[in-house]
Amino acid sequence: MSAPDLKELRAGIDRLNLEILDRLQERADVVVAIARLKQAQGLDVHDPGREEEMLQALSKRPTGAFGTFEIGEVFRAIFRVSLGVQEKARKDALKVRQKGLIAPGGIRVGNVAVGGGVPVMFAGPCAVENEEQLERVAAHLATLPVPTLLRGGAFKPRTNPYSFQGLREEGLRLLQDCARRHDLATVTEVLDVATLPLVAEYCDMLQVGARNMYNTELLKALGKIGKPVLLKRAFSATLEELLLSAEYIVSNGNDRVVLCERGIRTFERATRNTLDISAVPILKLETSLPVIVDLSHALGRRDILLPCGRAAIAAGADGLMVEVHAAPNLALSDGFQQIDLPSYTALVEGLGLVRAPGRA
């Protein structure tokens, strides 16, 4: 019997490769099942101790050309890839990552659709101060042919305990009354579970501020409230953490969630925060939930709103949030980053959301 030639040996290798691949695929199916079971039990996916046990057992097997070192190298690579498979399975199991979670028409808030293909403006003062102030802003917003939600804070979580904290229920009432007069839907922040029913009674969309992104009890309660939620990214949060916060809401029954990039904290001081523009397309790849950008809090300055707004829309943002005040220099909170009414008109014109008078 003649010795096998190179072609035959290579054919044998090809068969073995396919057999190994089949067994690796079989192993991967078991790995995914383990990952799902661990997730259901609240256990960490990665178990270094279990890996070491398997390596010890494998090193005791009779070997040929593969010694203990080679076996360790091969199986450590398999473990590393398997961990990636488990992590992908964990992520894919999240409701926020499921395709078709949001209808093609977007999330309806009043007569506005967020994520429906047309950028929406979330505009209004940082804080509701009085009826006259809010009326001037709302009346101006209503004159512009741009899909708009009226934002305004009634409960203000301030860094300084001596700063203006908001008008609370009176502010909610003013916001609702003013919005109704001008056929606008409202967005305002809810701070905790205790005030959630009150805020939900008055407002069309409930905002979770950056400070509350990790407030799991509030997130779970918002999942049961039945109203659209605007979820802001905390300034130190990863995008994965933002999606997991959204998962708390969605997994509790409310898939009407809009994500908001509002800037992250870095060493840079030229802006109030650092606008993570890459967050927009990444989130759009990871989830079907709409994504907007809060320009005012990300930048903390008025002079670069237009170019950054253009960048956000070009990146795929479904809307922009901008703080607008009739007299920013007299504002009771964050006056330095709010823009006046003519500046707001110029902004939406510059963004191409509405044509300036006299232009074709």
List the predicted regions and their residue ranges.
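Glycine-enriched alpha-helix->loop->beta-strand junction motifs that scaffold or abut catalytic
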Residues: 146, 198-207, 223-229, 250-256, ...
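Glycine-rich, proline-tolerant flexible connector loops at the mouths of alpha/beta enzymes
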Residues: 34-43, 151-169, 326-336
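Hydrophobic faces of well-ordered beta-strands that scaffold small-molecule active sites
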Residues: 119-125, 148-152, 186-189, 206-208, ...
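Domain-level signature for soluble enzymes in the chorismate/prephenate branch of the shikimate pathway
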Residues: 1-98
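N-terminal amphipathic alpha-helix/helix-capping segment at the start of soluble metabolic enzymes
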Residues: 88-122, 356-360
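N-terminal active-site wall of soluble small-molecule enzyme domains
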Residues: 152, 156-203, 207, 215-218
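Alpha-helix-loop-beta-strand connector modules within alpha/beta enzyme cores
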Residues: 44-58, 165-188, 222-228, 277-292, ...
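Conserved anion-binding
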Residues: 156-158, 212-278
